[in-house]
Amino acid sequence: MKLAQILAEMEKQLEAVGEEAESLSFTFRISKNLSFTQFVLKMQAEATEDDIELLKKIQSQLLVHRPAQYIIGNAEFHGHSFKVDERVLIPRPETEELVNLILSENQNSSLKVLDIGTGSGAIALSLAIDRDNWQVTASDISSNALELAQENAEVIDVAIDFVQSDCFQAITGKYDIIVSNPPYISETDREEVGLNVLTSEPHLALFAVEDGYAVYRKIAENAQKHLTEKGKIYLEIGYKQGEYVKKLFESAFPKMRIRVLQDQFGKDRMVVVDRG
């Protein structure tokens, strides 16, 4: 039997439990390190025992809603491959837009940067890769997340600092840029979250009390003493949170400009605090 026939049958089983059928072929192709052309040719060939065994192994994990990136063990972000597992969130394309915004607005200077809630280190390391004259510090409340972020720094061969901290609790000094993609999903919005996210990704990095605004409040209340005179704050937000977060920072920073910016789909996704 051709591999394509076996794959099609397995994909139907995935669709029956609400999983995307394409996850199986994607994970198989990446696991075998095949180009798209090589994958298409392989699908038309007779299935080998090894290939069938690999498909079954992948499918068994997808059936219990384990994300493809965790199965593969890495995720692509901003042109680089980051190791990911259940210790951290899988980096999202929307967060790449936040990184691109920071890079486009801060091009030449040597800056000090603090990433709050670094997770896999995707934001901090991406900034450090593109701006080798920046001094970047990555912080997280989770020691497990920091451990993985440090592994990514070693693999990518980028030197940044790491601090275990609940927001600013263990942070000293002032920074030119404070960036954060914090947990911002409220418990009332839990039903909007996909099963593969709920069952596998760390809830500490997903959900926040106070209707999802707890970490934004902490940042608003404490960032001032950790910002340089011309310092800026860049935040990722939930698509329904723009106006509230804007008002929160307008109250905390009455003399600064607060911008709500949209992602590529036209949804509120970033808040920027700067001097204008």
How would you name each of these model-derived features?
Residues 69, 185-188, 240:
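Active-site beta-alpha loop architecture of Rossmann-like, nucleotide-cofactor-dependent enzymes
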Residues 184-215:
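Mobile active-site "lid"/loop adjacent to the S-adenosyl-L-methionine
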Residues 94-192, 218:
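Conserved SAM/SAH cofactor-binding pocket of Class I
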Residues 210-274:
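Conserved Class I SAM-dependent methyltransferase catalytic core
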Residues 30-104:
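Conserved AdoMet
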Residues 1-47:
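Non-catalytic accessory regions of SAM-dependent methyltransferases
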Residues 27, 65, 95, 123, ...:
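Residue-level signal for inorganic ion chemistry
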Residues 72, 164-165, 262:
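Short loop/edge segments at beta-strand edges and connector loops
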